[in-house]
Amino acid sequence: MRFAIVVTGPAYGTQQASSAFQFAQALIAEGHELSSVFFYREGVYNANQLTSPASDEFDLVRGWQQLNTQHGVALNICVAAALRRGVVDETEAGRLGLASSNLQTGFTLSGLGALAEASLTCDRVVQF
């Protein structure tokens, strides 16, 4: 079965993102296809490369990145939500005159069209 996940919670502070990550790992372990994860609202903080969790905590941002590199899962973040919350790639940083970018490698700024496409092409869309 083909799945897409929508994450609306930040990397730290709520269970939404960590539950979504554990669900994603379980899907892959059970042989399902996870085509994409769409980060929306506060979920865009999962793509901030400047997060620095304590050494005894799981690094969720890098966990998502590994999911992308090891399993080819597309990590799309809503561009409008990201810009409002200060998560930008190099292109947007340059366009906005910002000194630097902070989008973690493996994540892609995208519009709601990516979520709509996932909804149409997947068997299930699960929101956290």
UniProtKB/Swiss-Prot annotation:
EC class name: transferase
Subcellular location: Cytoplasm
A GO term, aspect molecular function: sulfur carrier activity
Main location: cytoplasm
Alphabetical list of Pfam families matching this protein: DsrE
Active site residues of this protein: C78 (cysteine persulfide intermediate)
Keywords: Cytoplasm, Transferase, tRNA processing
UniProt superkingdom: Bacteria
GO CC, any one term: sulfurtransferase complex
GO biological process terms held by the UniProt record: tRNA wobble position uridine thiolation
Gene3D superfamilies attached to this UniProt entry: DsrEFH-like (3.40.1260.10)
EC number: 2.8.1.-
Function: Part of a sulfur-relay system required for 2-thiolation of 5-methylaminomethyl-2-thiouridine (mnm(5)s(2)U) at tRNA wobble positions. Accepts sulfur from TusA and transfers it in turn to TusE.
Subunit note: Heterohexamer, formed by a dimer of trimers. The hexameric TusBCD complex contains 2 copies each of TusB, TusC and TusD. The TusBCD complex interacts with TusE.
NCBIfam families in UniProt: PRK00207.1 (NF001237), sulf_tusD_dsrE (TIGR03012)
Family stated for the protein in its record: Belongs to the DsrE/TusD family.
Protein name per the record: Sulfurtransferase TusD
Native source species: Escherichia fergusonii (strain ATCC 35469 / DSM 13698 / CCUG 18766 / IAM 14443 / JCM 21226 / LMG 7866 / NBRC 102419 / NCTC 12128 / CDC 0568-73)
Lineage, highest ranks first: Bacteria, Pseudomonadati, Pseudomonadota, Gammaproteobacteria, Enterobacterales
Name of the gene this protein is made from: tusD
